[in-house]
Amino acid sequence: MPKAFAPLTATFLSAFLALNLLAVTPANSWFDKGHRIVGLIAQAHLTVGARKEIERILPGGMTLADAAVWPDHEGRQIREFDPLHYVRIPELASGYDQARDCPESNCMVEALNWFSAAVADKNAPIMMRRLALRYVAHLVGDMHQPLHAGRAADRGGIDISVAYRGATTNLHYFWDANLVDLETGNEEEIAKRLTANLTAADRLKWQAGDPKQWTDESLMLVRSHAYNTGASGELSDDYVEKARPVVRRKLAQAAIRLAWLLNNALK
């Protein structure tokens, strides 16, 4: 197992494990929608062996979609885990560099590496594997939302106010949630529609890479699409229509990669 990131020390471990004992009632806040869609699609692409092991690791009745939203709710009780949901990369950098961007290993790239290894470790305590599985399911989704690899100066778009058709929010929230909410249907219907649009070539091509590569892909998209808001902060219909296919593709891509990662980890 790789070296643990800074927050995962003996000081906090007991608290992390205690969180696993909490009753989990998945919330319905709308930013959960994207994570649940990723979990639903990924669930359908698991091997029989991986599915059985996930059922053994997670508490009774919890699905991969439920696990994917857990870190944004019960997991938020541990503030030291907050930086694990993103990485901040300098505006002119060509890609993620751990020494520069994550020297303490407390960002989504290194956390996903560590949690993936923990899921795969059959000698690890079941409670640790449970915690790790929830974070793997969540962080793969975060990693495919471009602004989770956004600039430090605006906290990945959180400090950029935007408006669309009279409703104001921030740029990060707009990509996290509003764009997903524009899709018609409930989570299951959207997941089925995205799955139906997948090609065999997509599935094959996306089952590759690692967290660094996936983060670099998001970095390119955050520059080519997300930050092109215009000076006024009023998002145009053209901006939204260009962003929506990006969001659909990244949801599907995250799901296929999550399933691929778990299928390999749980062989």
Regions found by a protein language model. Name each.
Residues 1-7:
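N-terminal secretory signal peptides that target proteins for export/translocation
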